[in-house]
């Protein structure tokens, strides 16, 4: 759970035209759902056609100290109040992490309103880790 809450980059694995398709995404996790945003494209088409997906998240300090989570879940597109809530969570979590020149204003998010907010309800989660303590 900690890895899912802490990180913001995941990989989603899904089936696209009968083949495995894995794509990195930014996300936010609320304890039940992984929320993401996407413009119309291959990722959304694949998840709409095959809503059972896999989500992978990792936290790597170095090759001897890492944690990872693999979760299976069901994709759904958000509408109405769910869209607004998902978009707000994503903006609140991800915007502070953007690196912008000092004199540049924050990005205008209105263009993203044309995209889709989706969520993946996680059904089954597994985790692995390696931790080597220094001598």
In which residue ranges do the predicted regions lie?
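Extreme N-terminal tail/first-helix region
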Residues: 1-5
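Short beta-strand segments
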Residues: 7-39, 55-56
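Broad gene-expression machinery/nucleic-acid interaction feature
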Residues: 22-24, 52, 70, 117
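Active-site-adjacent structural patch at catalytic or cofactor/ligand-binding sites
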Residues: 39, 49-58, 67-76
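A short macromolecule-binding patch
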Residues: 46
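Surface-exposed, gly/pro-biased binding rims or lids
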Residues: 61
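Charged, gly/pro-rich active-site loop segments
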Residues: 64-135
